[in-house]
Amino acid sequence: MKVAVIGSSHGGFETVRGVLHDFPNAEIDWYEKGDFVSFLSCGIELYLQGVVKDVNSVSYATIGGMEAKGVHVYINSEVTSIDPEQHSIKVVDVNNGEETESKYDKLVLSLGAVPFELPVPGKDLKNIYAMRGRDWEILLKKAEVDPDINNVSVIGSGYIGIEAAESFAKAGKKVTIIDQNPTILGTYLDSEFTDILTKTLEDHGISIKTSQSIKEIIGNDEDKVTSLVTTTGETIPTDLVIEAAGIRPATEWLKDTVKLDSQGLIMTDEYQETSQPDIFAVGDATKIEFAPTGTKKLIALAPNARRQGRSAAYNLNEKRRKTTAVSGSSALHVYNYKFASTGLKDVTAKKMGVDVESVFLTDDKVPASNNAKVYFELTFDPRTREVLGAQIMSKQDVTANINAISLAIQKHMTVDELAYADFFFQPGFDRPWNVMNIAAQKAQGKLNK
């Protein structure tokens, strides 16, 4: 069996890894448009802040290491078309434009996504960067130490935007975050958490402007950015723009090959197969089942892409195992605060039209003086009493609690079961009642009124 895998990020790497494990005699062709395989964009912050010294170490694999396992690795190779009937692909060498054709028995698409570009005047000026991919990472690192770059504007306040803002603020730049939503990190946290994080960022000199977007980007005679004009009419001095306002799937060239939805996402079944037999798709260009609602949605997280990649590999010859539903569990730090969330929150439930209730509480991590506060919110279905989501934050690392909530969501656990679930106690680690127990007991009280 000959397996072709297009794309070398999380989903592509896991697919190749899975094929090597499940079909050791398979021939594997692995295609990457860039000159580097398996780069981890989620590790850019570590490189920008000096935690990781070598840009090339932010990866899962090397070309030599994969070739030693028998994988045929093709870098600088862009797949431009697919012929499902002939089971063939056309590949263009991006360096010389030479086109070749290659056959496959099974094809896995791990196409990923590209940063959303601002559709405004001035969008083609110099010094407008994205925080995605190895090439951008190298440019961003240079910008951190560029004496001509003093004012940095970050468009978007999701994880990528917050990481960019903190990294450049620590590098001594004056940073402004601009977001059209009313709060930062609105996809991940409710206002009880974002209010604290907003103040934290502002205390570190970062200016935050929400409920507004970019109207125009202004440049100078050298076509370099000099300022931004927002929809409120404010002009913001800017030497560097970092676009972090979302992503779009890199699937335009596939519209006549496989079925895409209205967002351009590749439609797959529960086994990752597309509308075309023998063609599978994984990663940020696809949807995955969201456990709290049972519906499919885009959740662009590395673990999801890897789960899909492993599932696709396992199901190549026979549909044997469905891709597991996920809760969108994720975590981040903002200066001294560390937070994690999973499942539904009040703000996301409202957008999705799902009826939920929530309880919020603060607690101490351990029974000791001068102890870090823990902020926790539990979201649940008021009708079935099932746990649907949670958020946690503290200056100490308590994020692992979210993994238990994610499992509770997958297993349809109720707040009644969570209220007295067994968690360990040791004074140096935790309290006799875990914060999850306390929140679930509070939820019981709210429901039983």
Predicted regions and their residues:
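Short hydrophobic core segments
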Residues: 102-112, 237-246, 309, 385
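Glycine-rich dinucleotide-binding loop and its adjacent helix/turn
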Residues: 109-171, 207, 262, 268-270
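Rossmann-like dinucleotide-binding cores of NAD(P)H-dependent redox enzymes
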Residues: 58-59, 151-153, 159-216, 299-305, ...
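FAD-site-proximal beta/loop scaffold in flavoenzymes
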Residues: 126-148, 224, 234-311
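Flexible, glycine-rich terminal cap/loop adjacent to redox cofactors
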Residues: 6-10, 20-24, 33, 245, ...
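A Rossmann-like FAD-binding core segment of flavoenzymes
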Residues: 25-29, 68-95, 102, 171-268
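A conserved FAD-binding loop/helix module that cradles the flavin
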Residues: 268, 282-345, 430-448
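Beta1-alpha1 glycine-rich phosphate/pyrophosphate-binding loop at the start
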Residues: 1-72, 165-189
